[in-house]
Structures are given as C-alpha cells and as structure tokens.
A protein has these predicted regions:
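Membrane-embedded alpha-helical modules
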Residues: 79-191, 298-404
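N-terminal signal-anchor module of multipass membrane proteins
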Residues: 1-61, 68-79
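Membrane-embedded helical hairpins/re-entrant loop segments and their flanking transmembrane helices
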Residues: 2, 6-9, 34-52, 58, ...
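Interfacial segments of multi-pass membrane proteins
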Residues: 72-80, 157, 279-294, 300-305
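Hydrophobic, membrane-embedded alpha-helices of multi-pass small-molecule transporters
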Residues: 12-22, 145-149, 167-168, 200-233, ...
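Hydrophobic alpha-helical transmembrane segments of multi-pass membrane proteins
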Residues: 16-20, 115, 119, 140, ...
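Juxtamembrane interface elements at the cytosolic ends of transmembrane helices
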Residues: 24-27, 151-156, 167, 187-196, ...
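Short, non-helical or kinked segments that cap or interrupt transmembrane helices
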Residues: 35-41, 57-69, 111-120, 165-170, ...
Length: 408
C-alpha cells in the first residue's frame, strides 16, 4: 500500500505505532542520566517538529533521546551540575550548525567525495548491527516473551492484509504484552500511581539553563560522532523512502534541523536528540515513509508527555517485548545497507572496495574506541571516519576514476 493510499485514520495508527518503537529508548536515556522521562518525550516531539519545519516537511525522520551523550552528561553533571550541563548542549548544536554551513557552501560534490556507496553501504549495515546487542540484551530477559512478540510481528507482516499489514509492531507488542501480563511479569504499580494529567516537571517548574563556557567546550568534541552518524541515518532514510534527501531538501537542512532540535531540547531540560534508526526500521518493514506519519508520532509523544497514565503504561512494557520487535527492526536496517551496495553496483572484485568495506565493518563490529585526551570516538562515528579516510587515501583504478568522472 503506497503512502498516497493511506487514509487519515491509518496514518494515525501507523504514527502511534512508530512512537511505540521509539518510546523505549527515548525514556531510557533520561532515566540513565537523571532527567525526567516525560520531559524527554516532550522534547523528542518538539524536536521532531522543528526538524520537519527546517526540512520543509520532506524528510521522514523522528528525533529521540541520544545514547551518545549518556556518559558525557553523567560526567559533566558531576562537575557543573545538570543545569550547566544542559546549557553545554548548545556546543553540540554549534557543531551541527558549522557542518550545515560547510555542506551548504561546498554542495553535494563534497558529500559524494566523502561518502560514496562503498563507504555508506557498510555504515548503514553497522547502524543496524551496532544496535543488535541492545536488542538481544532486551530480548534475553525473557526469550519466550521476546519470540512471541517477534513471531506475531513476522506473521502479521507476512500474512496480513490491508490495515493489519501496516501495524505488525503494534500487534507484536500487544500480543507480547498480553502474554507477559498473564504470566505476571508486568508491573502495573507505576500506572496506578501516575496522575491522569501532569505537565512534565521541566515545564511545570521551568528554569533557564545556566550557561558556562566549560561544559559548552566539553560537549563540542562529543558531538562529532553523532554528526557523522546523522549523515549515515539520512542516507538510510533516503534508501528506505527511495528519495535522495541529501539533494532535496539537502543535508545542510537536516543538519540544521537536528542542531536546532538539540538546542530546544536543552532549553526545556531534556537530553540531546538524534535521528532514530528504530523508526527507520519500522518504515522499512511497513513501507510507510510519509513524513506526515512521523509528525503524528511526534504529536503523540507530546500528548503522552502530559497524560501520565498513558506514559506510565508504555513504560510498563517489559524489555523482552520490545527486544523481540527490535530483533526484526534492526536487522532490517542492516539489509538496507546490503541493498545499497547491490543497487550502486559496488564491485567487490576490486581490492580497494574490499579493503574499505572490510576495515569499516571490523572497526564497528569489534567495538574499537579512539581516545585522545578528553576526546573519544567509537562506534558508527569512528567506523564512518575510518571509511572516509580509506576512501580518500587508497588509489582508485582507472575504471573507477572514469566512472566517477561520468557521475560528476
């Protein structure tokens, strides 16, 4: 079913489903760093709307709490307190703004030179595979529940028709949650204690961030890895939606939107936000990539942030239920990376291509970490950086040079 054939009701249902996919990670980050989950939901929704405004409503991306800043926020809050640390997130926004201006200045030729398919393909694969450990960790808390959730989602996706085929995630979560409740492993105490309506604490008791240079400068190098991951995520979404969002509206706009969303998040007391691969995976399996559906997910996040019992109900979903669903979603992202390599006819008989792909994947899967003073880069950011450097320094064959000149 195409995006154009979706009725408003179906768009709403799929949009709510996308929030279910993003909910777990969005509220987990604030819990780990000592921030309020309801505020994180609010800033995720607000940040997504800001992103869509800047990108002219063209790019189907959902922004949620970023895991990349968990350790830096915990460390910085011990030195400068949480208000000062959140103000330091402005340094993250600055990095996005600078990169946006650089890409706008140099144009798409710079992107094509730094991120050809031989680099982007393995980076997309790693975005999926790097999340697989989190999926397994969640699923292994109760494999029976995880496989029930996964099996339900796969069955609906494979055999469903009409509306059912669009909601495999909701079906998987609903069945898994019901079985978990019958087994007595769902804790409803949070739902009972939660108020029906309550503003997020950061909004009810709003305080301006306390700006200081120290946390601002501390956060700047931390932002490099998320910025590199942002590029990979935009390429993933482009592949899933079959549209080149690096051309229209342009990567400079997606960078600017992400930066402004981070700025808004810290202003309202939430964690920094980033593009969410979980939602991209859900788009890939449902084939629904309409940006309006993502905006429905963002609006739902804001609504849930003020309806305490709904938010608490989602927080009561066992990790195993979400883990089972993530096993499907994250694997789907990795398959998009493989498809990207095939679609662009990357020749694996070329030694140069084999080297770039092999080293990029090994660095990412192996968990390599590069530390220089207070600066640390790892994961997707480091892998993408290694891929870019190898692509620039390894000599091309005459055939590759000719093909590149034709594309230019």
């Amino acid at each position: 079913m195409s995006n154009l054939q979706l009725s408003p009701m179906r768009k709403t249902i799929v949009g709510v489903q996308f929030l279910f996919v993003a909910f777990g990670a969005t509220v987990l980050v604030p819990l780990l760093v000592g921030l309020d989950p309801a505020t994180a939901l609010f800033t995720a929704g607000l940040g997504t709307f800001i992103f869509h405004l800047v990108t002219k409503g063209k790019v189907p991306i959902f922004l949620g709490s970023s895991f990349a800043f968990i350790t830096p926020i915990i460390s910085a809050s011990k030195q400068w307190g949480m208000p000062g640390t959140l103000a330091g997130i402005a340094g993250v926004a600055l990095v996005y703004f600078v990169m946006s201006a650089l890409i706008k200045w140099q144009g798409k030729k710079l992107l094509d030179k730094l991120f050809p398919p031989v680099v982007i393909g393995p980076v997309i694969i790693l975005i999926g595979l790097s999340l697989s450990k989190a999926a397994v960790d969640m699923a292994k808390t109760n494999w029976l529940i995880a496989f029930i959730s996964l099996g339900t989602a796969v069955t609906v996706l494979s055999m469903g028709r009409g509306l059912m085929k669009l909601v495999p995630v909701i079906c998987g979560i609903a069945v898994g949650y019901s079985v978990a409740a019958l087994m007595g492993i769902v804790n409803f105490s949070g739902v009972e204690a939660a108020p029906w309506f309550a503003l997020p604490p950061a909004l009810a008791h709003f305080q301006l961030p306390q700006f200081a240079w120290e946390p601002f400068l501390y956060m700047i190098p931390v932002a490099i890895a998320p910025v590199i991951e942002h590029v990979g995520d935009v390429y993933v979404v482009s592949a899933v939606a079959d549209k080149d969002f690096t051309k229209s509206p342009g990567l400079h706009r997606t960078m600017l939107g992400d930066g402004l969303a981070c700025l808004a998040a810290c202003f309202f007391g939430g964690p920094p936000v980033t593009t969410y691969s979980e939602v991209t995976g859900a788009m890939s399996i449902t084939k629904v990539t309409h940006p309006q559906v993502i905006r429905i997910a963002a609006a739902t996040a804001i609504v849930f942030s003020v309806i305490g019992k709904l938010s608490a109900l989602l927080q009561s979903i066992p990790s195993a239920v979400l883990g089972g669903i993530m096993l499907l979603l994250f694997g789907t992202i990795a398959s998009v990376g493989i498809q990207n390599l095939i679609q662009h006819k990357v020749d694996l008989n070329q030694t140069r291509n084999v080297i770039i792909i092999s080293v990029t994947l090994t660095v990412g899967i192996g968990g390599a970490v590069l530390t220089w003073g207070n600066f640390t880069i790892s994961g997707i950011g480091l892998s993408a950086l290694v891929g870019v450097i190898l692509n620039l320094i390894l000599p091309q064959t005459e055939v590759e040079k000719t093909e590149e000149e034709k594309e230019a």
